[in-house]
Amino acid sequence: MQEVTDATFADDVLSSEIPVIVEFGAPWCRPCKAIEPALAEIAAAAAGRVRVVKLDIDLNLRTPSQYAVLSVPTVILFAGGVPRETLVGPHSKSRYARTFAPYLDG
C-alpha cells in the first residue's frame, strides 16, 4: 500500500482523477494492520477505479487534523478532491465494500 505524507497528500489524493481510499493509521495500531488486507482486496478488485493509500498520523500531523481524524484506524474515501465517506474504527471487508461501492462502480 502506497504511503502518503502531508507534503504529498494534495497531489496523491486530492488531485487524483479516481477515488482514493486513505487509511489514517500508525505503526503501533494493531487494528490498522488488521484492516489492511481488506483494503488491499478492495483495491485489487477495483483496480484502475480506486487507489488505496495510508498516512502515518504520528509523522504527519497536519492532514489528520484537517480532516478531524481523532482515532485510528480512520478510513476516508476521497472523490473529486473531497472526503465522501468516513469509517472510524476497524470494520469488515464487506462493510468497507458496501460503503465505498457507489464510488467504485463508475
What are these regions (language model features)?
Residues Q2-V20, L61:
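A short beta-strand-turn-helix
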Residues T5, G25, R51-V53:
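Conserved Rossmann-like nucleotide-binding pocket used by diverse enzymes
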Residues E17-I18, F24-W28, S71:
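Short pre-active-site segment immediately N-terminal to redox-active cysteine/selenocysteine motifs
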Residues I21-V22, V52, V75:
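Hydrophobic beta-strand anchors of alpha/beta hydrolase catalytic cores
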Residues C29-C32, V75:
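The canonical Cys-X-X-Cys-His
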Residues P31-A46:
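Typically the conserved alpha-helix immediately C-terminal to a functionally engaged Cys/Sec
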Residues I57-T63:
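Structural microenvironment flanking redox-active thiols in thiol-disulfide oxidoreductases
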Residues S71, I76-G106:
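Non-catalytic, surface beta->alpha helical segment in thiol-disulfide oxidoreductase systems
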